[in-house]
Amino acid sequence: MSNVGTTGRIPLWFIGVIAGIAALSIVGLFFYGAYSGLGSSL
């Protein structure tokens, strides 16, 4: 297996890690905003 399956120079696992961190950050900010009372505007 070569790097044909990957998107360009970026490994697929790296994209998965970044997407996971971004998703956790968005969910964390949403729950933090809802807990502090600022998430009610969303």
UniProtKB/Swiss-Prot annotation:
Its main location: plastid. One of its GO terms (cellular component) is chloroplast thylakoid membrane. One of its GO terms (biological process) is photosynthesis. It is a single-pass membrane protein. The chain crosses the membrane at residues 10-30. Keywords: Chloroplast, Membrane, Photosynthesis, Photosystem II, Plastid, Reaction center, Thylakoid, Transmembrane, Transmembrane helix. It comes from the Eukaryota. It is found in: Plastid, Chloroplast thylakoid membrane. The keyword Thylakoid applies. PSII is composed of 1 copy each of membrane proteins PsbA, PsbB, PsbC, PsbD, PsbE, PsbF, PsbH, PsbI, PsbJ, PsbK, PsbL, PsbM, PsbT, PsbX, PsbY, PsbZ, Psb30/Ycf12, at least 3 peripheral proteins of the oxygen-evolving complex and a large number of cofactors. It forms dimeric complexes. One of the components of the core complex of photosystem II (PSII). PSII is a light-driven water:plastoquinone oxidoreductase that uses light energy to abstract electrons from H(2)O, generating O(2) and a proton gradient subsequently used for ATP formation. It consists of a core antenna complex that captures photons, and an electron transfer chain that converts photonic excitation into a charge separation. This is Photosystem II reaction center protein J.
